[in-house]
Protein backbone atom coordinates (compact mmCIF):
# COMPACT_ATOMS: atom_id res chain seq x y z
CA UNK A 1 0.00 0.00 0.00
CA UNK A 2 1.32 3.44 -0.87
CA UNK A 3 2.30 5.70 2.00
CA UNK A 4 0.04 8.51 0.73
CA UNK A 5 -3.01 6.24 1.05
CA UNK A 6 -2.42 5.06 4.60
CA UNK A 7 -4.56 6.39 7.44
CA UNK A 8 -1.94 7.51 9.95
CA UNK A 9 -0.05 10.68 9.19
CA UNK A 10 3.18 8.75 9.66
CA UNK A 11 4.63 5.35 8.99
CA UNK A 12 7.12 3.92 11.47
CA UNK A 13 10.21 1.80 10.95
CA UNK A 14 12.48 0.20 13.52
CA UNK A 15 15.99 1.26 12.57
CA UNK A 16 19.59 1.58 13.62
CA UNK A 17 20.70 5.21 13.53
CA UNK A 18 24.15 6.70 13.08
CA UNK A 19 25.85 9.91 12.01
CA UNK A 20 28.54 10.60 9.43
CA UNK A 21 29.40 14.29 9.66
CA UNK A 22 26.26 16.28 8.80
CA UNK A 23 24.46 13.16 7.54
CA UNK A 24 22.26 11.09 9.83
CA UNK A 25 21.39 7.65 8.50
CA UNK A 26 18.78 5.06 9.42
CA UNK A 27 19.32 1.40 8.47
CA UNK A 28 16.08 -0.54 8.18
CA UNK A 29 14.14 -3.00 6.02
CA UNK A 30 11.05 -2.46 3.89
CA UNK A 31 8.75 -5.09 2.54
CA UNK A 32 8.94 -5.27 -1.21
CA UNK A 33 5.60 -3.56 -1.85
CA UNK A 34 6.59 -0.56 0.31
CA UNK A 35 9.93 -0.24 -1.49
CA UNK A 36 8.59 -0.42 -5.05
CA UNK A 37 5.55 1.76 -4.39
CA UNK A 38 7.15 4.51 -2.29
CA UNK A 39 10.82 4.85 -3.21
CA UNK A 40 11.10 7.06 -6.26
CA UNK A 41 13.60 7.97 -8.91
CA UNK A 42 14.56 11.65 -8.99
CA UNK A 43 12.78 12.26 -12.30
CA UNK A 44 9.49 11.03 -10.79
CA UNK A 45 9.43 13.80 -8.17
CA UNK A 46 7.74 17.10 -8.93
CA UNK A 47 9.79 20.03 -7.73
CA UNK A 48 12.19 22.80 -8.45
CA UNK A 49 15.37 20.70 -8.79
CA UNK A 50 16.18 19.51 -12.27
CA UNK A 51 16.71 15.82 -13.00
CA UNK A 52 20.37 16.34 -13.85
CA UNK A 53 20.98 18.03 -10.50
CA UNK A 54 19.39 15.22 -8.50
CA UNK A 55 20.44 11.95 -10.03
CA UNK A 56 23.80 10.25 -9.88
CA UNK A 57 23.78 8.63 -13.30
CA UNK A 58 21.46 7.69 -16.13
CA UNK A 59 19.62 4.40 -15.70
CA UNK A 60 20.46 1.50 -17.97
CA UNK A 61 16.95 0.05 -18.14
CA UNK A 62 18.08 -2.88 -20.27
CA UNK A 63 20.59 -3.96 -17.60
CA UNK A 64 17.97 -3.66 -14.85
CA UNK A 65 15.32 -5.55 -16.81
CA UNK A 66 17.58 -8.35 -18.05
CA UNK A 67 20.72 -9.00 -16.01
CA UNK A 68 19.49 -7.92 -12.56
CA UNK A 69 15.90 -9.07 -13.08
CA UNK A 70 17.06 -12.55 -14.14
CA UNK A 71 19.20 -12.72 -10.98
CA UNK A 72 16.04 -12.17 -8.93
CA UNK A 73 13.63 -14.28 -10.96
CA UNK A 74 15.75 -17.37 -11.60
CA UNK A 75 15.86 -18.36 -7.94
CA UNK A 76 18.67 -19.79 -5.89
CA UNK A 77 20.64 -17.98 -3.23
CA UNK A 78 20.62 -14.27 -3.89
CA UNK A 79 21.00 -11.03 -1.97
CA UNK A 80 20.91 -7.31 -2.67
CA UNK A 81 22.98 -4.77 -0.83
CA UNK A 82 21.11 -1.84 0.72
CA UNK A 83 19.34 0.71 -1.42
CA UNK A 84 20.36 4.21 -0.30
CA UNK A 85 17.51 6.70 -0.17
CA UNK A 86 17.57 10.41 0.66
CA UNK A 87 14.57 11.95 2.42
CA UNK A 88 13.63 15.32 0.92
CA UNK A 89 10.60 17.60 0.87
CA UNK A 90 8.08 16.73 -1.81
CA UNK A 91 7.40 20.42 -2.42
CA UNK A 92 8.97 23.79 -1.68
CA UNK A 93 6.31 24.40 0.97
CA UNK A 94 6.94 21.18 2.91
CA UNK A 95 9.27 21.81 5.85
CA UNK A 96 8.68 18.84 8.19
CA UNK A 97 8.63 15.23 7.06
CA UNK A 98 10.64 13.01 9.44
CA UNK A 99 11.53 12.47 13.07
CA UNK A 100 12.75 9.66 15.28
CA UNK A 101 12.25 8.41 18.82
CA UNK A 102 14.87 6.57 20.85
CA UNK A 103 13.95 3.01 21.82
CA UNK A 104 13.94 2.14 25.51
CA UNK A 105 13.99 -1.15 27.37
CA UNK A 106 13.43 -1.25 31.11
CA UNK A 107 13.50 2.55 31.13
CA UNK A 108 16.98 2.69 29.56
CA UNK A 109 17.78 3.93 26.08
CA UNK A 110 19.02 1.21 23.74
CA UNK A 111 21.97 2.83 22.01
CA UNK A 112 21.48 3.49 18.27
CA UNK A 113 18.05 1.76 18.08
CA UNK A 114 15.28 4.16 17.06
CA UNK A 115 11.78 4.35 15.68
CA UNK A 116 11.91 6.39 12.46
CA UNK A 117 8.73 8.32 11.67
CA UNK A 118 8.18 9.33 8.04
CA UNK A 119 5.37 11.74 7.33
CA UNK A 120 3.03 11.64 4.35
CA UNK A 121 4.31 13.09 1.11
CA UNK A 122 7.99 12.84 2.00
CA UNK A 123 10.05 12.35 -1.15
CA UNK A 124 12.05 9.13 -0.80
CA UNK A 125 14.59 9.37 -3.63
CA UNK A 126 16.96 6.51 -4.44
CA UNK A 127 20.53 7.76 -4.84
CA UNK A 128 22.35 4.41 -4.84
CA UNK A 129 20.71 1.23 -6.09
CA UNK A 130 18.62 2.67 -8.93
CA UNK A 131 19.11 -0.43 -11.10
CA UNK A 132 18.23 -2.73 -8.20
CA UNK A 133 15.06 -0.73 -7.53
CA UNK A 134 14.05 -0.82 -11.19
CA UNK A 135 14.51 -4.60 -11.32
CA UNK A 136 12.58 -4.97 -8.03
CA UNK A 137 9.71 -3.03 -9.62
CA UNK A 138 9.74 -5.34 -12.64
CA UNK A 139 9.79 -8.38 -10.32
CA UNK A 140 6.93 -6.94 -8.23
CA UNK A 141 4.85 -6.25 -11.35
CA UNK A 142 5.31 -9.88 -12.42
CA UNK A 143 4.53 -11.07 -8.87
CA UNK A 144 1.26 -9.12 -8.78
CA UNK A 145 0.27 -10.02 -12.37
CA UNK A 146 0.51 -6.41 -13.54
CA UNK A 147 3.29 -7.28 -16.01
CA UNK A 148 3.34 -11.07 -16.59
CA UNK A 149 6.48 -12.96 -17.49
CA UNK A 150 7.11 -13.52 -21.18
CA UNK A 151 6.90 -17.02 -22.69
CA UNK A 152 10.71 -16.97 -23.03
CA UNK A 153 11.14 -16.07 -19.36
CA UNK A 154 8.78 -18.88 -18.36
CA UNK A 155 10.77 -21.27 -20.56
CA UNK A 156 13.94 -20.15 -18.72
CA UNK A 157 12.27 -20.96 -15.37
CA UNK A 158 11.78 -17.40 -14.19
CA UNK A 159 9.52 -17.27 -11.14
CA UNK A 160 8.28 -14.23 -9.28
CA UNK A 161 6.25 -15.88 -6.53
CA UNK A 162 8.56 -15.00 -3.64
CA UNK A 163 8.67 -11.64 -1.86
CA UNK A 164 11.68 -10.03 -0.20
CA UNK A 165 12.60 -7.75 2.67
CA UNK A 166 14.59 -4.91 1.12
CA UNK A 167 17.52 -3.43 3.09
CA UNK A 168 17.35 0.36 2.96
CA UNK A 169 19.52 3.16 4.30
CA UNK A 170 17.61 6.43 4.68
CA UNK A 171 19.72 9.61 4.71
CA UNK A 172 18.85 13.01 6.12
CA UNK A 173 21.03 16.11 6.10
CA UNK A 174 21.44 18.05 9.33
CA UNK A 175 17.93 18.78 10.56
CA UNK A 176 16.42 19.48 7.13
CA UNK A 177 12.81 18.34 7.43
CA UNK A 178 12.97 17.16 11.04
CA UNK A 179 9.78 17.88 12.94
CA UNK A 180 10.25 20.89 15.20
CA UNK A 181 13.75 21.59 13.87
CA UNK A 182 13.13 22.00 10.15
CA UNK A 183 15.57 24.18 8.25
CA UNK A 184 14.29 24.97 4.78
CA UNK A 185 17.15 27.22 3.70
CA UNK A 186 18.25 27.09 0.09
CA UNK A 187 21.88 26.76 1.25
CA UNK A 188 21.20 23.37 2.88
CA UNK A 189 19.30 22.19 -0.21
CA UNK A 190 22.20 23.21 -2.44
CA UNK A 191 24.60 21.24 -0.23
CA UNK A 192 22.34 18.19 -0.52
CA UNK A 193 22.49 18.34 -4.31
CA UNK A 194 26.29 18.40 -4.16
CA UNK A 195 26.48 15.61 -1.57
CA UNK A 196 24.25 13.22 -3.53
CA UNK A 197 26.45 13.55 -6.61
CA UNK A 198 29.41 11.89 -4.84
What feature does the model see in each segment?
Residues 79, 89, 98-198:
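Basic- and aromatic-enriched surface patches that contact anionic nucleotides/nucleic acids
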Residues 1-123:
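N-terminal extension/subdomain marker
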Amino acid sequence: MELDDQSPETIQYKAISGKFGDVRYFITTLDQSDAVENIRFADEIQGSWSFSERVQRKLDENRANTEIFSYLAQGGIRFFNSIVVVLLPNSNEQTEFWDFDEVKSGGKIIEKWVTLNLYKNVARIVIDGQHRLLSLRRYWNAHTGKEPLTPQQLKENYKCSETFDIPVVYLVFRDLGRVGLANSSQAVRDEIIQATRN
